[in-house]
A protein has these predicted regions:
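Short, solvent-exposed alpha-helical "recognition" segments
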Residues: 27-34
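Intrinsically disordered and other compositionally biased segments
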Residues: 23-24, 39, 63, 67-68
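Short amphipathic alpha-helix starts
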Residues: 10, 42-43, 47
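Short Lys/Arg-enriched helix C-cap and helix-to-coil transition segments
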Residues: 34-40
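Short, flexible helix/strand-to-coil boundary loops that buttress conserved ligand/catalytic motifs
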Residues: 25, 37, 51-55
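A short, Lys/Arg-enriched interface patch at domain edges and termini
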Residues: 45-68
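Polyanion-binding surface elements
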Residues: 1-23, 53
Length: 68
């Protein structure tokens, strides 16, 4: 089992701000996460899967995973 990532580590891996990762989590649009007591943790595989789901081949392709 790979070590779990903190929110800061997940943000660093994704090259996003911690605040953006937090907003994505709260809105339900971010990677799957674990809530352990008061801590939020991410499995590396879930972060990578979330990122892979956002691959598009052109700018005209609609990203159906990112509704606002």
């Amino acid at each position: 089992m790979q070590p779990l990532l903190t929110q800061d580590e997940a943000a660093e891996l994704l090259k996003l701000s911690v605040r953006t990762v937090e907003r994505l989590r709260v809105s339900g649009r971010g990677p799957k996460f674990l809530k352990i007591l008061r801590s939020v943790r991410y499995r590396p595989a879930d972060v990578e899967a979330w990122l892979a789901a956002r691959i598009v081949s052109s700018t005209s392709e609609e990203n159906t995973n990112d509704h606002r």
